[in-house]
Amino acid sequence: MHRDFYIRLINREHPLPETFVPEHLIDIGLPFEAAPGDPKRLLECQAARAASQLFHACHRCGLNLWAVSGYRSFRRQQELFTGSPFVAKPGTSEHQSGLALDVSCPSIHMELSEKFSETGEGRWLKKNAPLYGFILRYPKNREEITGVPYEPWHI
């Protein structure tokens, strides 16, 4: 995969085509809310390796980080978009790239909510995600810039 792929901006102004599927998707093999075989357990291979390192470091700190959603196809995004006004339009979700991951923790029942930022896992992630090649992509008070509401669970 060309290295520019890893720095590509994906949003309303820079969508992915419907036919885009990452070349090297693998199961991240980490604590995951989804059952084995579910496509949302997949990430692009380099992102999966980085996520594995991030999760292991978090767990060594005594925290209980879980993955909730990784890769999402254009078609799956279309299904979710049809059912909710809060879901990104198909082609504009970073999940289609296989580089994005939603995370949560058992203390908030694996919810994807702002409450995650108040957990030990959320605070650890905010501080440490960049050490593993991830960022909190949709930070608080940056909605005008990102065009997306605050999502402390999305890396």
Predicted regions mapped to residue ranges:
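Extracytoplasmic cell-surface/polysaccharide-interacting catalytic and binding patches
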Residues: 1-70, 74-155
